[in-house]
Amino acid sequence: MAVPKKRTSRSKKKIRKNVRKGKKHIGPAIKAFSLAKSISTGHSKSFYCIVNDDSSGSSESKLTAFDLDDP
């Protein structure tokens, strides 16, 4: 009878278990929810949006930090 040489690691067991249980597609949803939560609370330091400045007449775009407290 064939015997495995090394013990299977916990992380590999967990990955295989999650694939069997159908939990492999939850990761992107959790990341999206986490990003939305950090933006809504104002704690996001890595989310930027492009703002077009039409008041000056030029078509330049600025990269500014997204802030929900600014009206």
From Swiss-Prot:
What does the record give under GO molecular function? Answer: structural constituent of ribosome
Subcellular location per UniProt equals: Plastid, Chloroplast
An example GO BP is:
translation
> Does Cell membrane appear among the keywords?
no
Q: Which InterPro entries match?
A: Ribosomal_bL32, Ribosomal_bL32_plant/cyanobact
Question: GO cellular component terms?
Answer: chloroplast; large ribosomal subunit
PANTHER family with a match to the protein in the record: 50S RIBOSOMAL PROTEIN L32, CHLOROPLASTIC (PTHR36083), LARGE RIBOSOMAL SUBUNIT PROTEIN BL32C (PTHR36083:SF1)
- Family according to the record: Belongs to the bacterial ribosomal protein bL32 family.
Please state what the protein is called: Large ribosomal subunit protein bL32c
Organism whose genome encodes this protein: Pinus koraiensis (Korean pine)
